Amino acid sequence: PQFSPDGKELAFIEDRNRLMVLNLETKKVRRITDGSTWYSTGGGFDYAWSPDGKWFTLEFIGNKHDPYSDIGLVSAQGNGEIVNLTNSGYTSGSPSFVLDGNAILFITERYGMRAHASWGSLDDAMLVFLNQDAYDKFSLSKEDYELYKEANSDRKKIADKDSSKVKDVVVELKNIEDRIVRLTPNSSNMGSTLISKDGKTLYYLA
């Protein structure tokens, strides 16, 4: 189970294939996914809340392509379809929101040795940027990024003063397939992955 960012709700997996949310005040439960996008009964799937509590990213089986999972995005209100963010045809998993909710970090075997015979796959760490502004900022050269920081220093000071307010996650689905970035220089047998808050450093076990 995972608490929502504001601590008012609790997400959990029911019967190993459905994502559900319990409102801790009203005790009402709402369904986020209906179970049709996860066929395994071996232990559930990975998912994560967005920082604003309005979205989930999750592993799911898209296009009835079991056992290969994709990375999805779905409304936390329980009234939306899962958006397939990867459509790779190969296994992707372990999604988490990073960079203040502007991107999703995940691992995939789309570039490494693939499990065509159900063994021997290698992984890479990836980012999918949810909006163009975050992608453009990430793509800046070191010199351009320093200029960007200098030009926006006053704006950052104002934002730091109001840091207690949670910003809404901006989701722009148009051309999102062009905002997927490979972070690791080579594929490996990966464990967990983390990225620093400023997006400069990737940590992973391999």
What are these model-derived regions, one by one?
Residues 45, 82-96, 181-191:
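Conserved blade-ending motifs and adjacent loop-strand segments that build the rim/top face
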Residues 1-9, 47-56, 95-104, 193-201:
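Blade-terminus and WD-like Trp-Asp/Gly-His loop motifs, strongest in beta-propeller folds
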Residues 184-206:
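Beta-strand-rich domains and repeat architectures in extracellular enzymes and scaffolds
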Residues 8-24, 34-42, 54, 59-72, ...:
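A flexible loop/linker signature enriched in serine peptidases of the S9 family
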Residues 30, 99-102, 181:
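Solvent-exposed, polar/charged alpha-helical surfaces in well-ordered, non-transmembrane soluble domains
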